[in-house]
Amino acid sequence: MRFLTKFLLFLATVYFGLKYACESPLRAQYPQLQLACHYSQPALWNDYLLKNSPAYKNSVHPQLVVAKGKYEELVQPHVKDVCKRVHTQLDRIDKKKYCDLAHSYANLAYQKAQFYYSISAGKYVHDFCKSDLYNKNLKRHVERAKEDLSKAYHLAVVRIPQLFTRENVEKFTSSASAYINEKTESLKKEAKQITSDVKKTVESEIKKRTTSSESEEEPIVSTSTIVKTITRTRHSSSSTTSTKSAEETSEKNLETKEEEDITDIEIDHQAQLQRDFDKWTSNIDKKVKMVNKMLVRDVKKHLKPKIDANDKLFKDKLKVLHKEANDNFQLINKAIQDINCTQGIDPETGKQIYFDSEGKSQIEKYITREMIRTMLNDTQTTLNSLVADIENDVSKILEDFKKIAENSREQHLTTFEEWGDIMINEWSKKLAYLDVLAPHEDAEHEGKSKTELSEKNWKKFMAIKKQILDARDKMAKRQIKISEFKLLLDNVQNTLQAVTNENGEYLYILRAQANLAFQERERLEKEAEEAKLRKEAGEVNESSEEEQIVEEPISA
């Protein structure tokens, strides 16, 4: 059932892939593709069956017409909507990496198929290709099929990716560019309109304030940390006859007004200080995120050449591992086949020689259990050595990654600490300045005395300082994750694990096959030895009977 499900899924994948290729512009360039598209159309087979099959025409076709009508009415609108959304999402996907991934898996499957083919079926296929049945009847058909498969492979691997890289990308780029330009122009118009409205509002407000102040007040600007507008009553220049008591009264009123303004300045300082606390708290989080982002970027920059170089190195070493395993397994498999050998005598030297199981080719030496055991152990040692060498390279690149990460982390931590020290010093100076600036210890803001406000401000300052130190500690302990580096290590380790398991399993299978072959050979040798002994015993009995027959007359 599982095989049937996979087979049906494979057929569906091939059908829809062929349908997609038939709708592409490449169809006109390949006659084989046109032929495949022609014979894969359901309408063609429907017409053929209507003409040639009465059962299909009378029983199946009417039901198909009803089902098609229900499909177009109930299902097709939803399918079109889903297809539209899917195609929209597909146009946004970078298809190159998926093509590369599929190619890597296909390459791995090809290597494994070639490996098992060379071990199990290669010999039989080679003998079949030399037979008259193949050369006289099947060879021309196989060559034609190979030619068609080669053209189909060229279509699938070389031409189809162009659909994803040229036409669709150009279409998406042009539509995206037009959409962005349209939105940009709209935003520019809105920004100009807002600027114009704000400018008109500000100018009218300034004009109103200027007109009203000309008749009543004269603005005096204070240049303290928080700008505050203080007004004084304009004294007429013509009142030169005012008395001394009037002047004293005016001075007292002015002093009282300045004291009130100082209190207002303190209140504005407190409000501005709270806003600054909030800004710096959020700014610390932004700074930490920026430093972490720069850290990952620098580590990626330094690791990129090493990742590329080690990727090629690991691929080459894994190829060597595959080749070494294939070669050793073929030698062991050949030796196991030669266990069931036949004996012969060299006519020139008179020495005993051995031939393969079919008696066609001479083998170098008689296969023993010790020879097979040595070959298996040597193969295991060689493969373990190659795996250990690759694991050693993995350990080295891990050490390099740790060094690069720690060096970059140290640099960025130093920068962050310097920034934090400067900020903390500036904040401490600012709070000390505010403590000295206030002349009245009993000044109140929101029901709190100046002492309570100062204590509250210093507590907030200590909280910000602690936030900086905690952020620094988290950055020092934070793990740096590079997706490209992790992908490389995962691929190598997974491949090594799979190869090690496969090699171990196959060595176990070869060992079991060798034991069975030796047991069979020992059984045959034992039977041959017993037959030989029985034959010799029979000859001895016959000779003794003849002697007795001869001796009886003599004794008589």
Curated annotation (Swiss-Prot):
Subunit structure comment from the entry: Component of the mitochondria-localized RNase mitochondrial RNA-processing (RNase MRP) composed of one single RNA encoded by the NME1 gene and at least 31 proteins. Absent in the nucleus-localized RNase MRP (NuMRP).
Record's keyword annotation contains Transcription: no
Gene Ontology cellular component terms for the protein in this record: mitochondrion; ribonucleoprotein complex
Annotated family: Belongs to the SHE10 family.
UniProt feature coiled coil, ranges: 135-201, 481-547
Subcellular location: Mitochondrion
Keyword Signal: yes
Keywords of this entry: Coiled coil, Mitochondrion, Ribonucleoprotein, Signal, Sporulation
Region described as Disordered: 190-263, 534-556
Protein name listed in UniProt: Outer spore wall assembly protein SHE10
Bias-annotated ranges (Basic and acidic residues): 190-208, 245-256
Biased composition (Low complexity): 220-244
Primary role: Involved in spore wall assembly. May be a component of the mitochondrial RNase MRP (MtMRP), a ribonucleoprotein endoribonuclease involved in the cleaving RNA transcripts to generate primers for DNA replication in mitochondria.
Biological processes annotated in GO: sporulation resulting in formation of a cellular spore
Signal peptide residue numbers: 1-21
Organism of provenance: Candida glabrata (strain ATCC 2001 / BCRC 20586 / JCM 3761 / NBRC 0622 / NRRL Y-65 / CBS 138)
Chief location bin: mitochondrion
